[in-house]
């Protein structure tokens, strides 16, 4: 049919693709957004359900790809010529900025999915002209097709760039599968590029953010808010790099190592730069930042403000960065673009011009470079690197590997011939299986022992959930494998109820010891497996007691990590501020989300869908998995039985819900007729009746014929969480 026309006569498509009308979020901005649970669904994946990236990568001739990348480094293109005749600096920056969005608070960001191709990252001010880097790579991506993802190719290119400039890298692992749509992440509250509303008090950076301004990877190179104070800048550097899991030595190594190569681009007035890729014209074909200054590229390129070349050999690995940093005094200067930067005082022109061999420049530095000299902690490290170039090279190689692989998870996910053999503490290592695994008869006998131990359904379910639900699909950390729930810091987390946890683990360890001691053939069961098996046994019992027979899938093979394999500080970031699945909020820590938002956030980290989130909350409530045995949301008269009572009673129109007097975020459900108190609940409970989409899911499980479906779906979602970190199983399937 014909589209309606407005008063100006322009046709308007009545469908969403051509309309600029209001969406639900525009009308109701405070509406809980659960769309993140269905981000990057299979429907947006053009590769199809049968595609296995790991299998494709194994077919890749990595040496051939690297040979092509080496050739590209010096194959300068007219449309975007290489500085100094070598693209190395550009590609190092591309790989760095692909990985550098990683943040430890929630494990999101990073190089693992090739998100630099999509908005907003492809249009961040800090990523200006990296679109050109990816276009330079396109012929190589096109040549090798599905055998190498964009995510892997960007990191590999950074490695090859370093190697082509004489640096020995620590290694490379493939295995990063591409996604096909932007990740819906919270990057900050600002509505303008380079805004910094994320600070409060004494420059306290809001969590979970890891950068100082909207659209930057880390810090402002001119200094905090453009203030050229190296000492103040050091504070920003330390905070932002720490939020990317880097310590002081790694930070110094990364900054100095990265700035050994290439240059920054501030040749002229930045107001002459066109819009970023996402705001560009159709005919620009996804390229952005088209400049009207001179030719717009080469010697006239503008990427940001500063125009800095750090070393005398910007296409070769050297120790010139530190030699220059400490060898000169520095005076404040301005770039041709008007940005604050520093030049070596009274220095000879020893630095090459990127395009005119007859010209030389004096060494220049950024405010954030000088932080490595004027911050006392950074200075000590920097002087050691100055005097010991071999230590600097090793530190940079290791820090670069960590930067580009931090969000890949355990070593089982690493692919390719260049995977380093050394096991690193930040990889959260777990021992390889070194014994025969339990069989079906053993599993049934162990379940019977667990159920006869005196531990309740609630205790077993809570412990298994506490162990497995630390998993983060973002950076593939956490999970039940390793049984780190018995180690610091997890054993002491408030949410895990340490005293009761110790009691449960003590009984499970006794069962483990008795079983392992009785075996004659080397067969063993790990505590990690036993914790998960205890949850399975409890769920089977709870379902049976509710009149529904079910078998919870269980695959042995988890192992127990040691304290020596566990970085306590690194694991502290996995402690939940809130866990809506257990109706828990840590009142001692700042909450930057409403409880129901935190629930959705955790569900997304667990890779759950909306229906899976719904069925898990309903099941965990009736099983008694609440923190501190709270009765909030336990909407059943039959606790520890796996019934659909939570949904039935929540949606009962005979109950009227009101806020409890004097109780923060607690609600009372009273009989509509006589006012008698029936239930209490939290925001996390009531959202399943309030939010229209979650209510629709809840209605499915509240129906009179839904009990079997509820149990089946709960077991499936439960098993998904219990096995979320079983990359060993995936690796075995791929090897078979």
From Swiss-Prot:
EC number: 1.11.1.21
Organism encoding this protein: Rhodopseudomonas palustris (strain ATCC BAA-98 / CGA009)
Reactions listed under catalytic activity: H2O2 + AH2 = A + 2 H2O; 2 H2O2 = O2 + 2 H2O
InterPro entries: Catalase_peroxidase, Haem_peroxidase, Haem_peroxidase_sf, Peroxidases_AS, Peroxidases_heam-ligand_BS
Gene this protein is translated from: katG
Cofactor note: Binds 1 heme b (iron(II)-protoporphyrin IX) group per dimer.
Cross-link Tryptophyl-tyrosyl-methioninium (Tyr-Met) (with W-96): residue positions: 218-244
Spans through the membrane: none
Role this protein plays: Bifunctional enzyme with both catalase and broad-spectrum peroxidase activity.
Site entry: Transition state stabilizer: 93
Subunit structure: Homodimer or homotetramer.
PTM field: Formation of the three residue Trp-Tyr-Met cross-link is important for the catalase, but not the peroxidase activity of the enzyme.
Entry's Gene Ontology molecular function annotations: catalase activity; heme binding; metal ion binding
GO cellular component, as recorded: cytosol
Binding site for heme b: 259
Protein name per Swiss-Prot or TrEMBL: Catalase-peroxidase
Key words, A-Z: Heme, Hydrogen peroxide, Iron, Metal-binding, Oxidoreductase, Peroxidase
HAMAP family recorded: Catal_peroxid
Iron in keyword set: yes
Amino acid composition bias (Basic and acidic residues), ranges on this chain: 1-10
